[in-house]
Amino acid sequence: MAKEAYKREKPHVNIGTIGHVDHGKTTLTAAITTVLAKKGMAQLREFGDIDKAPEERERGITISTAHVEYETDKRHYAHIDCPGHADYIKNMITGAAQMDGAILVVAGTDGPMPQTREHILLARQVNVPALVVFLNKVDIADPELIELVELELRELLSEYEFPGDDIPIIKGSALKALDGDPESEAAIMELMDAVDSYIPEPVRDVDKPFLMPIEDVFSISGRGTVGTGRIESGVIKIGEEVEIVGIKPTRKSVVTGIEMFQKTLDQGQAGDNAGILFRGVDKEELERGMVIAKPGTITPHTKFKAEVYILKKEEGGRHTPFFNNYRPQFYFRTTDVTGAVTLPEGVEMVMPGDNLSVEVELIVPIAMDENLRFAIREGGRTVGAGTVTQIIE
Protein backbone atom coordinates (compact mmCIF):
# COMPACT_ATOMS: atom_id res chain seq x y z
CA MET A 1 0.00 0.00 0.00
CA ALA A 2 1.42 3.38 -1.02
CA LYS A 3 1.88 5.84 1.82
CA GLU A 4 -0.68 8.61 1.60
CA ALA A 5 0.46 12.20 1.73
CA TYR A 6 0.06 13.55 5.26
CA LYS A 7 -3.24 15.40 5.42
CA ARG A 8 -4.20 17.64 8.32
CA GLU A 9 -7.52 15.93 8.86
CA LYS A 10 -6.69 14.22 12.13
CA PRO A 11 -5.98 16.09 15.36
CA HIS A 12 -2.25 16.35 16.10
CA VAL A 13 -0.89 15.26 19.50
CA ASN A 14 2.68 15.34 20.85
CA ILE A 15 3.68 12.44 23.08
CA GLY A 16 6.84 10.81 24.36
CA THR A 17 8.16 7.76 26.17
CA ILE A 18 9.46 8.30 29.71
CA GLY A 19 10.77 5.92 32.39
CA HIS A 20 13.86 4.29 33.92
CA VAL A 21 16.96 3.47 31.89
CA ASP A 22 16.78 0.07 30.14
CA HIS A 23 13.10 -0.45 30.87
CA GLY A 24 12.44 -0.46 27.12
CA LYS A 25 11.47 3.09 26.07
CA THR A 26 13.30 3.00 22.76
CA THR A 27 12.30 -0.62 22.07
CA LEU A 28 8.67 0.37 22.65
CA THR A 29 9.03 3.37 20.31
CA ALA A 30 10.43 1.04 17.62
CA ALA A 31 7.66 -1.51 18.31
CA ILE A 32 4.92 1.11 17.89
CA THR A 33 6.26 2.14 14.47
CA THR A 34 6.74 -1.52 13.46
CA VAL A 35 3.20 -2.55 14.36
CA LEU A 36 1.61 0.58 12.86
CA ALA A 37 3.77 0.32 9.71
CA LYS A 38 2.06 -3.00 8.96
CA LYS A 39 -1.20 -1.06 8.84
CA GLY A 40 0.33 1.62 6.62
CA MET A 41 0.15 4.21 9.42
CA ALA A 42 3.82 4.75 10.17
CA GLN A 43 7.23 4.51 8.62
CA LEU A 44 9.21 1.70 10.15
CA ARG A 45 11.95 2.99 12.46
CA GLU A 46 14.60 0.55 13.67
CA PHE A 47 15.80 0.54 17.28
CA GLY A 48 19.33 1.58 16.25
CA ASP A 49 17.99 4.43 14.17
CA ILE A 50 15.95 5.83 17.10
CA ASP A 51 18.76 5.20 19.59
CA LYS A 52 21.21 7.37 17.62
CA ALA A 53 19.16 10.45 18.36
CA PRO A 54 20.37 13.69 16.77
CA GLU A 55 21.42 16.56 19.02
CA GLU A 56 19.34 19.71 19.05
CA ARG A 57 19.73 23.04 20.75
CA GLU A 58 16.91 24.60 22.72
CA ARG A 59 17.45 27.79 24.76
CA GLY A 60 21.21 27.29 24.44
CA ILE A 61 21.11 23.71 25.73
CA THR A 62 22.09 20.67 23.69
CA ILE A 63 19.62 17.80 23.94
CA SER A 64 19.55 14.49 22.10
CA THR A 65 16.03 13.63 21.00
CA ALA A 66 14.63 11.20 18.45
CA HIS A 67 11.44 12.27 16.68
CA VAL A 68 9.12 9.64 15.25
CA GLU A 69 5.75 10.19 13.66
CA TYR A 70 2.84 7.85 13.19
CA GLU A 71 -0.94 7.82 13.13
CA THR A 72 -3.83 5.85 14.51
CA ASP A 73 -7.37 5.81 13.13
CA LYS A 74 -8.16 8.83 15.27
CA ARG A 75 -5.02 10.95 15.47
CA HIS A 76 -1.65 11.96 14.10
CA TYR A 77 1.21 11.71 16.62
CA ALA A 78 4.67 13.19 16.95
CA HIS A 79 6.54 10.97 19.42
CA ILE A 80 9.81 11.80 21.12
CA ASP A 81 12.28 9.43 22.69
CA CYS A 82 15.49 10.49 24.45
CA PRO A 83 18.53 8.23 24.76
CA GLY A 84 19.88 9.50 28.08
CA HIS A 85 18.34 10.29 31.45
CA ALA A 86 19.82 13.82 31.45
CA ASP A 87 18.26 14.40 28.01
CA TYR A 88 14.83 13.68 29.48
CA ILE A 89 15.31 16.11 32.32
CA LYS A 90 16.55 18.83 29.95
CA ASN A 91 13.77 18.10 27.48
CA MET A 92 11.01 18.32 30.05
CA ILE A 93 12.36 21.42 31.75
CA THR A 94 13.13 23.40 28.58
CA GLY A 95 9.91 22.26 26.93
CA ALA A 96 12.05 21.52 23.85
CA ALA A 97 9.58 18.83 22.93
CA GLN A 98 6.27 19.88 24.38
CA MET A 99 4.39 16.79 25.54
CA ASP A 100 0.59 16.65 25.51
CA GLY A 101 0.88 13.30 27.23
CA ALA A 102 3.43 10.56 27.85
CA ILE A 103 3.77 6.79 27.89
CA LEU A 104 5.49 5.74 31.11
CA VAL A 105 7.45 2.54 30.43
CA VAL A 106 8.08 0.28 33.43
CA ALA A 107 9.73 -3.13 33.28
CA GLY A 108 7.58 -5.77 34.97
CA THR A 109 10.81 -7.49 36.03
CA ASP A 110 12.00 -4.46 38.08
CA GLY A 111 8.96 -2.39 38.91
CA PRO A 112 9.30 1.35 39.59
CA MET A 113 12.95 2.47 39.88
CA PRO A 114 14.55 5.83 40.86
CA GLN A 115 14.21 7.39 37.39
CA THR A 116 10.60 6.16 37.15
CA ARG A 117 9.85 8.27 40.21
CA GLU A 118 11.93 11.18 38.93
CA HIS A 119 10.19 11.22 35.54
CA ILE A 120 6.72 11.07 37.17
CA LEU A 121 7.69 13.98 39.45
CA LEU A 122 9.00 15.98 36.49
CA ALA A 123 5.88 15.22 34.47
CA ARG A 124 3.87 16.61 37.39
CA GLN A 125 6.10 19.66 37.85
CA VAL A 126 6.05 20.68 34.18
CA ASN A 127 2.36 19.77 33.87
CA VAL A 128 2.30 16.91 31.38
CA PRO A 129 -1.51 16.57 31.21
CA ALA A 130 -1.84 12.77 31.22
CA LEU A 131 0.17 9.55 31.46
CA VAL A 132 -0.54 6.05 30.15
CA VAL A 133 1.57 3.15 31.48
CA PHE A 134 3.14 0.36 29.44
CA LEU A 135 4.21 -2.49 31.73
CA ASN A 136 6.98 -4.02 29.64
CA LYS A 137 8.83 -7.38 29.72
CA VAL A 138 5.80 -9.20 31.17
CA ASP A 139 6.81 -12.31 29.20
CA ILE A 140 9.82 -12.80 31.48
CA ALA A 141 8.35 -11.52 34.77
CA ASP A 142 6.64 -13.58 37.46
CA PRO A 143 2.83 -13.02 37.19
CA GLU A 144 2.49 -12.44 40.95
CA LEU A 145 5.25 -9.86 40.79
CA ILE A 146 3.42 -8.09 37.94
CA GLU A 147 0.33 -7.65 40.12
CA LEU A 148 2.46 -6.12 42.88
CA VAL A 149 4.22 -3.83 40.40
CA GLU A 150 0.86 -2.61 39.13
CA LEU A 151 -0.33 -1.78 42.66
CA GLU A 152 2.95 -0.07 43.47
CA LEU A 153 2.75 1.99 40.27
CA ARG A 154 -0.80 3.14 40.94
CA GLU A 155 0.26 4.27 44.44
CA LEU A 156 3.31 6.06 43.07
CA LEU A 157 1.25 7.88 40.42
CA SER A 158 -1.31 8.95 43.05
CA GLU A 159 1.51 10.18 45.29
CA TYR A 160 2.42 12.68 42.55
CA GLU A 161 -1.21 13.71 42.05
CA PHE A 162 -1.88 11.73 38.89
CA PRO A 163 -5.13 9.71 39.00
CA GLY A 164 -3.39 6.43 39.88
CA ASP A 165 -6.59 4.41 40.08
CA ASP A 166 -7.78 5.43 36.61
CA ILE A 167 -4.61 5.48 34.53
CA PRO A 168 -4.61 2.72 31.90
CA ILE A 169 -1.84 0.17 32.49
CA ILE A 170 -1.20 -1.96 29.40
CA LYS A 171 0.90 -5.11 29.81
CA GLY A 172 3.07 -6.45 27.02
CA SER A 173 6.50 -7.12 25.57
CA ALA A 174 7.94 -4.48 23.25
CA LEU A 175 10.71 -6.84 22.15
CA LYS A 176 8.29 -9.63 21.20
CA ALA A 177 6.10 -7.12 19.36
CA LEU A 178 9.19 -6.11 17.37
CA ASP A 179 9.67 -9.79 16.48
CA GLY A 180 6.10 -10.02 15.21
CA ASP A 181 4.51 -12.05 18.03
CA PRO A 182 0.72 -11.62 17.46
CA GLU A 183 -0.21 -11.39 21.15
CA SER A 184 2.48 -8.76 21.76
CA GLU A 185 1.40 -6.82 18.66
CA ALA A 186 -2.16 -6.80 20.02
CA ALA A 187 -0.83 -5.27 23.27
CA ILE A 188 0.77 -2.44 21.24
CA MET A 189 -2.58 -1.76 19.53
CA GLU A 190 -4.25 -1.80 22.95
CA LEU A 191 -1.67 0.75 24.13
CA MET A 192 -2.40 3.00 21.14
CA ASP A 193 -6.14 2.78 21.86
CA ALA A 194 -5.45 3.83 25.46
CA VAL A 195 -3.30 6.75 24.26
CA ASP A 196 -6.05 7.76 21.79
CA SER A 197 -8.77 7.77 24.40
CA TYR A 198 -6.97 8.72 27.62
CA ILE A 199 -4.59 11.49 26.53
CA PRO A 200 -6.73 14.60 25.98
CA GLU A 201 -6.59 16.47 22.71
CA PRO A 202 -4.50 19.62 23.27
CA VAL A 203 -6.02 23.07 22.96
CA ARG A 204 -4.45 24.55 19.83
CA ASP A 205 -2.40 27.72 20.30
CA VAL A 206 -4.89 29.63 18.14
CA ASP A 207 -7.72 28.76 20.55
CA LYS A 208 -5.88 30.08 23.62
CA PRO A 209 -6.12 33.75 24.73
CA PHE A 210 -4.09 36.24 22.68
CA LEU A 211 -0.47 36.81 23.77
CA MET A 212 2.49 38.35 21.95
CA PRO A 213 5.90 38.98 23.55
CA ILE A 214 7.42 42.26 22.36
CA GLU A 215 10.75 41.93 20.59
CA ASP A 216 11.14 45.41 19.14
CA VAL A 217 9.48 48.83 19.35
CA PHE A 218 9.43 51.74 16.94
CA SER A 219 7.23 54.72 16.17
CA ILE A 220 5.62 55.61 12.86
CA SER A 221 5.18 59.37 12.61
CA GLY A 222 1.55 60.39 12.58
CA ARG A 223 0.37 56.86 13.33
CA GLY A 224 1.75 55.89 16.71
CA THR A 225 3.85 53.16 18.31
CA VAL A 226 4.39 49.68 16.89
CA GLY A 227 5.44 46.61 18.86
CA THR A 228 6.75 43.66 16.86
CA GLY A 229 7.06 40.00 17.79
CA ARG A 230 5.80 36.52 17.12
CA ILE A 231 2.24 35.90 18.28
CA GLU A 232 2.52 33.07 20.81
CA SER A 233 -1.18 32.26 21.16
CA GLY A 234 -4.65 33.35 20.16
CA VAL A 235 -5.95 35.74 17.55
CA ILE A 236 -5.93 39.56 17.49
CA LYS A 237 -8.18 41.84 15.43
CA ILE A 238 -8.11 45.58 14.78
CA GLY A 239 -10.18 47.51 17.31
CA GLU A 240 -9.69 44.98 20.11
CA GLU A 241 -8.58 46.06 23.57
CA VAL A 242 -5.31 44.61 24.89
CA GLU A 243 -3.19 44.88 28.02
CA ILE A 244 0.51 45.68 28.02
CA VAL A 245 1.98 43.58 30.83
CA GLY A 246 5.37 43.33 32.54
CA ILE A 247 8.32 45.49 33.65
CA LYS A 248 6.13 48.62 34.16
CA PRO A 249 2.59 48.89 35.60
CA THR A 250 0.01 47.11 33.41
CA ARG A 251 -1.90 49.41 31.07
CA LYS A 252 -4.64 49.01 28.47
CA SER A 253 -4.66 50.10 24.84
CA VAL A 254 -6.56 49.45 21.62
CA VAL A 255 -5.05 47.83 18.52
CA THR A 256 -5.31 50.26 15.59
CA GLY A 257 -3.30 48.30 13.05
CA ILE A 258 -1.73 44.90 12.36
CA GLU A 259 1.04 44.40 9.83
CA MET A 260 2.86 41.37 8.53
CA PHE A 261 5.64 41.53 5.91
CA GLN A 262 4.70 45.17 5.16
CA LYS A 263 1.09 44.18 4.42
CA THR A 264 -1.83 45.35 6.54
CA LEU A 265 -4.06 42.64 7.92
CA ASP A 266 -7.36 42.75 9.76
CA GLN A 267 -6.17 40.01 12.12
CA GLY A 268 -3.05 38.17 13.28
CA GLN A 269 -2.88 34.72 14.83
CA ALA A 270 -0.57 32.32 16.73
CA GLY A 271 2.64 31.74 14.77
CA ASP A 272 2.52 35.03 12.85
CA ASN A 273 5.42 37.48 13.08
CA ALA A 274 3.51 40.73 13.28
CA GLY A 275 3.77 44.41 14.00
CA ILE A 276 0.94 45.77 16.14
CA LEU A 277 0.04 49.45 16.26
CA PHE A 278 -1.37 50.85 19.52
CA ARG A 279 -3.57 53.85 20.22
CA GLY A 280 -2.19 56.45 22.61
CA VAL A 281 1.00 54.62 23.58
CA ASP A 282 4.37 56.42 23.51
CA LYS A 283 7.48 54.63 22.29
CA GLU A 284 8.96 55.05 25.80
CA GLU A 285 6.10 53.08 27.34
CA LEU A 286 6.79 49.90 25.38
CA GLU A 287 9.91 47.78 25.66
CA ARG A 288 11.29 44.41 24.79
CA GLY A 289 10.26 41.84 27.42
CA MET A 290 6.73 43.14 27.88
CA VAL A 291 3.82 41.16 26.48
CA ILE A 292 0.64 42.25 24.74
CA ALA A 293 -2.27 40.13 25.94
CA LYS A 294 -6.02 39.77 26.04
CA PRO A 295 -7.13 41.80 29.12
CA GLY A 296 -7.29 39.81 32.35
CA THR A 297 -5.49 36.72 31.05
CA ILE A 298 -1.95 37.20 32.41
CA THR A 299 -0.45 39.13 35.30
CA PRO A 300 3.05 40.38 36.17
CA HIS A 301 4.99 38.72 39.00
CA THR A 302 8.41 38.84 40.64
CA LYS A 303 8.40 35.82 42.99
CA PHE A 304 7.92 32.24 41.92
CA LYS A 305 8.97 28.64 42.48
CA ALA A 306 10.66 26.78 39.64
CA GLU A 307 12.07 23.42 38.67
CA VAL A 308 15.53 24.04 37.19
CA TYR A 309 18.33 22.12 35.50
CA ILE A 310 21.86 23.49 35.83
CA LEU A 311 24.20 22.72 32.96
CA LYS A 312 27.30 20.61 33.46
CA LYS A 313 30.69 22.12 32.70
CA GLU A 314 30.91 19.86 29.60
CA GLU A 315 27.62 21.31 28.37
CA GLY A 316 29.03 24.82 28.45
CA GLY A 317 27.70 25.55 31.93
CA ARG A 318 29.37 26.81 35.08
CA HIS A 319 32.59 25.19 36.30
CA THR A 320 31.81 25.81 39.97
CA PRO A 321 28.82 25.39 42.27
CA PHE A 322 26.58 28.30 43.27
CA PHE A 323 25.11 29.11 46.68
CA ASN A 324 22.04 30.68 48.24
CA ASN A 325 21.22 34.16 46.91
CA TYR A 326 22.94 33.44 43.57
CA ARG A 327 22.01 36.29 41.17
CA PRO A 328 22.02 35.36 37.48
CA GLN A 329 19.75 36.68 34.69
CA PHE A 330 16.50 34.90 33.89
CA TYR A 331 15.65 34.99 30.21
CA PHE A 332 11.86 35.04 29.76
CA ARG A 333 10.57 34.99 26.16
CA THR A 334 12.54 37.95 24.78
CA THR A 335 14.50 39.49 27.63
CA ASP A 336 16.89 38.98 30.53
CA VAL A 337 15.86 40.02 34.06
CA THR A 338 18.15 39.74 37.08
CA GLY A 339 16.83 37.69 39.98
CA ALA A 340 17.98 36.13 43.25
CA VAL A 341 17.76 32.39 43.88
CA THR A 342 16.75 30.93 47.26
CA LEU A 343 17.77 27.29 47.68
CA PRO A 344 15.50 24.77 49.43
CA GLU A 345 16.13 24.08 53.12
CA GLY A 346 19.02 21.71 53.67
CA VAL A 347 20.63 22.45 50.27
CA GLU A 348 23.94 24.24 50.79
CA MET A 349 25.02 24.54 47.18
CA VAL A 350 24.11 23.54 43.65
CA MET A 351 26.56 21.68 41.43
CA PRO A 352 26.69 21.86 37.63
CA GLY A 353 24.45 18.98 36.38
CA ASP A 354 21.95 19.25 39.26
CA ASN A 355 18.18 19.40 38.86
CA LEU A 356 16.17 20.90 41.75
CA SER A 357 13.32 23.17 42.88
CA VAL A 358 14.23 26.75 43.79
CA GLU A 359 12.54 30.03 44.64
CA VAL A 360 13.34 33.11 42.54
CA GLU A 361 12.74 36.82 43.11
CA LEU A 362 13.15 39.09 40.05
CA ILE A 363 14.09 42.78 40.26
CA VAL A 364 11.21 43.76 37.92
CA PRO A 365 7.88 42.01 37.30
CA ILE A 366 7.43 39.83 34.20
CA ALA A 367 4.15 38.57 32.72
CA MET A 368 4.04 34.94 33.78
CA ASP A 369 1.89 31.98 34.60
CA GLU A 370 2.66 28.44 35.67
CA ASN A 371 4.55 26.38 33.07
CA LEU A 372 6.37 29.37 31.60
CA ARG A 373 9.87 28.28 30.51
CA PHE A 374 13.02 30.33 30.96
CA ALA A 375 16.77 30.13 30.56
CA ILE A 376 19.24 31.00 33.32
CA ARG A 377 22.11 33.08 31.96
CA GLU A 378 25.30 34.75 33.09
CA GLY A 379 26.39 37.54 30.80
CA GLY A 380 24.54 36.11 27.81
CA ARG A 381 25.80 32.55 28.33
CA THR A 382 23.20 29.93 29.19
CA VAL A 383 23.98 28.10 32.42
CA GLY A 384 20.60 26.47 33.07
CA ALA A 385 16.93 26.20 32.25
CA GLY A 386 13.72 26.18 34.20
CA THR A 387 9.95 26.01 34.33
CA VAL A 388 7.75 28.13 36.60
CA THR A 389 5.89 25.66 38.83
CA GLN A 390 4.14 28.05 41.24
CA ILE A 391 3.62 31.80 41.44
CA ILE A 392 4.21 33.32 44.88
CA GLU A 393 3.57 37.03 44.26
From Swiss-Prot:
Role, per record: GTP hydrolase that promotes the GTP-dependent binding of aminoacyl-tRNA to the A-site of ribosomes during protein biosynthesis.
Full protein name: Elongation factor Tu
Known EC number: 3.6.5.3
Keyword Cell inner membrane carried by entry: no
Region (G2): 60-64
Keywords for the protein's UniProt record, in alphabetical order: Cytoplasm, Elongation factor, GTP-binding, Hydrolase, Magnesium, Metal-binding, Nucleotide-binding, Protein biosynthesis
G5: annotated segments: 173-175
Gene name for this UniProt entry: tuf
Main location: cytoplasm
PROSITE patterns registered for this protein in UniProt: G_TR_1, G_TR_2
Source organism of this protein record: Prosthecochloris aestuarii (strain DSM 271 / SK 413)
Location within or outside the cell: Cytoplasm
Region described as G1: spans on this chain: 19-26
Annotated positions binding GTP: 19-26, 81-85, 136-139
Reaction(s) this enzyme catalyzes, per UniProt: GTP + H2O = GDP + phosphate + H(+)
Ranges where the record places region G3: 81-84
Record-linked Gene3D superfamilies: P-loop containing nucleotide triphosphate hydrolases, Translation factors
Complex and partners: Monomer.
Keyword Hydrolase applies: yes
